[in-house]
Amino acid sequence: MSKTFSPSEAAFSVFELMKRQPQFVMRYAMLSAGVMAIYMFVMASTGAGDALQRYAVLAQSEQMPTMEQVQSILGPAMPSLFFSFLISAILSAFLTGMALRKTLHDREEGFWGLQAGPIEGRFLLATLAFVAVISVAAFVIGFITSLIATIHMALGSLAILASIGAMIWFGLRLSQFGVMGVVTGKLGLRESFEQTNGKFWRYFGAYLLWLVIVIILGTIVQGLATIGALALGTKIGSGLPANAQEFATVGWAFYVLLYGMVTGVFNLGFLCIGAYAWHQSRGDLPPPKSDL
């Protein structure tokens, strides 16, 4: 049984899925665009989009925004922002459950693969636990870094770099909680730490390679979507509609459909990395052709 996997094969595994299961990938992309549309509609309807637009304008000004200015804009919008992010997290859990069932067990259950089952519930709880653990770790590391900085400025700079590296290492070690939650029936955080043991650089390389592709292609597609929306009479601007009336245009519909579907494929690619690594590490797939 192979105990390792190829980072490059894992990074490009979504293309293999697209070749074998094009209908599933298309459904996932369309549902992702739908989730983006719902998220943007909630942001626009609750006033959160307008607040973020005003904050973006403030942040781009020549002078550094004061804490009072930031609070005056974002403070009243915090309930709306929290509600919008909560809706997005819940809907994303459904999409993730759909993708993990398919990539790990080749199963599609429910409407278009969507199901409100234990996988979705565990993933949502695990996501909250992941955010909590990362937040605590960031606070502890930040506190230690600040103490070191008070001793010597040069040591403080090195400590900042070390803390960034530590957070990347820790976050990546826990990043497979979705995959491990499905295969073990648990939250998957501890199991993720075990799964990534000795494979950090392989996971890092796979995610970094796919991230570079996402940045390049995402920039191109977003530009095309923005130009297309502008041709239809809609100026996208910051990427968020200020209100529901502004969102209810053909231009925004075109932007969300194109960019949302492509973003869905990008997100599916990140999930495929974990699933592919799991299968290849177990020997379910042919062993890596190379170490790269």
Task: Map each language-model feature to its residues.
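Short, charged juxtamembrane terminal tails flanking transmembrane helices
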Residues: 1-2, 284-292
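Interfacial aromatic "cap" segments that immediately flank transmembrane helices
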Residues: 2-38, 113-136, 169-217, 268-271, ...
